[in-house]
């Protein structure tokens, strides 16, 4: 049985073949991002005891829609989105805080079987954010786009900087080149845990996603332009930065029709 960890600040366990994926990820081996090279990145926060806490990342894809991981919004909580965020512990003067009005989770998502895929959700905001230098829409790939092996990509987020460590206060980024499906699904990597509707990146044992990065974007450079090709989903429960256990993302290009249909009908 393969153990994996979802990368929100809550842990889910899914089924696999050698060790469980964990869906609670933060950037390990990364560096602080400049303010703000990734303006589509948002912080998804929940209300508890009168205070707001970061739980996941996400991508602004419309002025009133955010894309994140389904496992980030499994629990019934009061959520808000903070766009234009850089340092969670201080007011940067660029933040826009907006309540989440509606949550649409992919209908095939099963929190008891993370490895089945469909770890994607859309959040409709109570109001539109204002676009500026610090808040921009993420560019999505064309439907069906498949990344080449070793394609340049960056993961971003406020997740833990090491396994069982602390959440980052400033937005982090780490270079995670893509790992093609044939390699990532081989027995020495993730095996059958990884599906064709997922994207793998990293796996060098140094840099990875970790708890708190879940739902956030994988930005990949294709034809000279960055687009959001992945939604951070899970890592190995053996640790965030385990060699040959790349961070696994929901492949955005597999869900373009679903995304468009949800937005059009809501």
Swiss-Prot record:
Keywords: Calcium, Disulfide bond, Glycoprotein, Hydrolase, Metal-binding, Protease, Secreted, Serine protease, Signal, Zymogen
Pfam families referenced in this protein's UniProt entry, alphabetically: Trypsin
Catalytic activity: Hydrolysis of proteins, including elastin. Preferential cleavage: Ala-|-Xaa
Family annotation (InterPro entries): Peptidase_S1_Elastase_sf, Peptidase_S1_PA, Peptidase_S1_PA_chymotrypsin, Peptidase_S1A, Trypsin_dom, TRYPSIN_HIS, TRYPSIN_SER
GO molecular function: metal ion binding; serine-type endopeptidase activity
Propeptide position ranges: 17-26
Protein family according to the UniProt entry: Belongs to the peptidase S1 family. Elastase subfamily.
Function (record text): Serine proteases that hydrolyze many proteins in addition to elastin.
Protein name: Chymotrypsin-like elastase family member 1
Organism whose genome encodes this protein: Felis catus
């Amino acid at each position: 049985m393969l153990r994996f960890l979802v990368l929100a600040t809550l842990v889910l366990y899914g089924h696999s073949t050698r060790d469980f994926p964990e869906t609670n990820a933060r950037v390990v081996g990364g560096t602080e991002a400049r303010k703000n090279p990734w303006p589509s990145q948002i912080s998804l926060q929940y209300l508890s005891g009168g205070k707001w806490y970061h739980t996941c990342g996400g991508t602004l894809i419309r002025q009133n829609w955010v894309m994140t991981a389904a496992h980030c919004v499994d629990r019934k909580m009061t959520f808000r989105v903070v766009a234009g965020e850089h340092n969670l512990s201080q007011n940067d003067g660029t933040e826009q805080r907006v309540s989440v009005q509606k949550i649409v989770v992919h209908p095939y998502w099963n929190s008891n079987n993370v490895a089945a895929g469909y770890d994607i959700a859309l959040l409709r905001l109570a109001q539109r954010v204002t676009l500026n230098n610090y808040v921009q829409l993420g560019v999505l790939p064309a439907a069906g786009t498949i990344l080449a092996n070793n394609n340049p990509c960056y993961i971003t987020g406020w997740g833990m900087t090491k396994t069982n460590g602390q959440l980052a206060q400033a937005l982090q980024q780490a270079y995670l080149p893509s790992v093609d499906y044939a390699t990532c699904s081989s027995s020495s990597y993730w095996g059958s845990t990884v599906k064709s509707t997922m994207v793998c990146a990293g796996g060098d044992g140094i840099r990875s996603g970790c708890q708190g990065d879940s739902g956030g974007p994988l930005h990949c450079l294709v034809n000279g332009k960055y687009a959001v090709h992945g939604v951070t989903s899970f890592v190995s429960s053996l640790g965030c930065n385990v060699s040959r256990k790349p961070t696994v993302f929901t492949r955005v290009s597999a869900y373009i029709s679903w995304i468009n249909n949800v937005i059009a009908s809501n």
